[in-house]
Amino acid sequence: MSKGRTDYGNGAVKYVIRAKLRANGYVERPDVVGAIFGQTEGLLGDDLDLRRLLKTGRIGRIDVKLRNENGKTVGEIIVPSSLDRVETALVAAALEQVDRIGPCRAEVEVVSIDDIRKEKRERMIRRAREILREMVSEVTPDSSELVQKVKEAVEDVEVEEYKGLPAGPNVEDSDAIIVVEGRADVANLLRCGIKNVIAVEGTNVPEAIVELSKEKTVTAFVDGDRGGELILKELLQVADVDYVAKAPKGKEVEELTRKEIKRALERKVPVEEYLKEIGERPKDKEREKGKKPKPKKRPERRGRPRKKKARPKRGPQERRLLDRLKRLKGTFRAEFLDEGLKPVKEVELDELVEKLKSEDGVRAVVLDGVITRRLVEAAREKGVKYVVGVKEGDLDPEIKKDVKIITMS
């Protein structure tokens, strides 16, 4: 281990959660670890279950350092994380829910969340300086250009503030703005010459963003991970967003190159199209303004009242498939089911068709979204019998001959 560096045993570690612990009695490390796993179970759902995260390597080994003072125990809990910022913050908050260790009352308080990548960047800059010093004796006429490029790469751009939020200088005057997650995202876009950018700084969208969205064209530019989805969900609920742009899958806006940023913004889609893709209705503008739509007058009918159409009776298999759909509600994901209608794989909606094409033995596809023509065609090719979704898109009767389409309605 190098001097001044901590080895967390996982090269993918992005953050380290540090929390202090106090217990009103004598406890040992196994008691603490057991309490953490036991009392956080079920708090964050299956995807962020600590045992599952540890097993898959998304968090590292939980380190506990304890000392006993006058019959009480104090110490430190250290949790390395390769999750994104939002998920890491959720795990940290879950640690604070531990209130009992063994027979003793206890209290856990998160002290800090360290950004390991910041430490790596600082080491990289120090090493770059050393390399440049070693090259001084070999300076060529072009070396000044090299020095300038290295300086530009490590220089921090000036991030301004708009009503307390990190922002570029053109936010107030521009007719259109780009909304990102954090300060680092703003800095990265400023380096690329994009100055009409502002950050929400968390999942609670500030009032300043809501007000700006009422008078400007808004593009939400989010990370290509679960954290980005959460930010986008919150934005769409409270702000008037016009376009949606996403970083490549698994990447954060703050780490994108100029070329990747340009490509992502060029591929932005209208919010109505995005909502259609994930199976949600665009907001009704009349309802947003508080106006109730006028009820349509229906002509009076004489004679016997018309009978309501009865919903088709569902067979046991269909009911079982619709139950699977209810479990997926709000996840923007899809499941592949085998011959026994048991789940074999779960995928993101944006990679559903490609994953289906490479998967064998799938009998049913259940998705929290719209059933599209492209999906049904892929299902026919793979011999899928059922496709189950929130609603049906514009489908030709011809392509539905070999695949049974099931929706909630």
Curated annotation (Swiss-Prot):
Q: Please, which domain of life does this record's source organism belong to?
A: Archaea
- Kindly list the GO molecular function terms attached to this UniProt entry: DNA-directed RNA polymerase activity; metal ion binding; poly(A) binding
The UniProt annotation places Mg(2+) 2 binding at: D223, D225
Q: Which SUPFAM superfamilies match?
A: DNA primase core
Cleaved signal peptide residues = none
- Top-level EC class, please? transferase
**Key words of the record:** DNA replication, DNA-directed RNA polymerase, Exosome, Magnesium, Metal-binding, Nucleotidyltransferase, Primosome, Transcription, Transferase
Q: How is the cofactor bound?
A: Binds two Mg(2+) per subunit.
The keyword Transcription is annotated on this UniProt entry? yes
Q: Which CDD domains match?
A: TOPRIM_primases (cd01029)
Region Disordered, residue ranges: 280-322
NCBIfam families xref list: PRK04031.1-1
Name of the molecule in the record: DNA primase DnaG
User: Which species is this UniProt entry from?
Assistant: Methanopyrus kandleri (strain AV19 / DSM 6324 / JCM 9639 / NBRC 100938)
- Give the gene symbol: dnaG
